[in-house]
Amino acid sequence: MRRIGIAALAAAALTYGANAQAQKKYGPQGVSDTEIKIGQTMPHSGPVSVYGIMGRVHMAYFQMVNERGGVNGRKVTLISADDAFSPPKTVEQTRKLVENDGVFMMFGSSSTAGQSAVQKYLNAKKVPQLMLSTGASKFNDPKNFPFTTPILQLYSTEGEVYAQYLMDTKPDAKVAILMQNDDFGRD
């Protein structure tokens, strides 16, 4: 039994060792034997800078992950770039993160309009655009955008739930809808 355990451990070490060597040479951008580099765009300044707190929470989370040994022994480095809630700035910062900083993926970025502006670019580059802080239906399209995944429920689903609640509990209620005139509001 002990020989089988030692043989299994040796086989696993050789397998993972070979994978680590291959990764040095052939691995994806932003991933090395010691680090996983990820990026995000957040409104750390501008009209909705209060949402920048999400980026700081993500930084704290990955700091905790790193203090506990990282991911498979790799340190996670999150670069949180300020897009000031401006789609042109989102495009600029995303390109910098991918092309200059060499991030493996984009994680937890916010702004429906900003993420709409970079969705095609990131999918064309095959850079994962994961856990987007938006519920716009355009980000739930794996056939056309396989590298994009939102974290929030779809806004249309949320609207249906609210409408059903009103119909069930206040059937005579008058409803007003306010929207902002951009991708977020139109969805």
Where are these regions (language model features)?
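Residues at or immediately flanking beta-strands
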Residues: 35-37, 73-78, 174
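Short, low-complexity disordered leader/linker segments with a strong preference
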Residues: 1-36
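Flexible, small-residue-rich helix->loop connector segments that border functional cores
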Residues: 61-71, 166
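Hydrophobic alpha-helical segments typical of transmembrane helices
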Residues: 40, 61, 93, 135, ...
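Extracytoplasmic ligand/sensor domains, especially the bilobed periplasmic-binding protein
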Residues: 88, 102-187
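Extracytoplasmic
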Residues: 33-35, 53, 73, 85, ...
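Extracytoplasmic "Venus flytrap"
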Residues: 26-59, 81-88, 110-111, 178-186
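Structural motif
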Residues: 75-100, 158-161
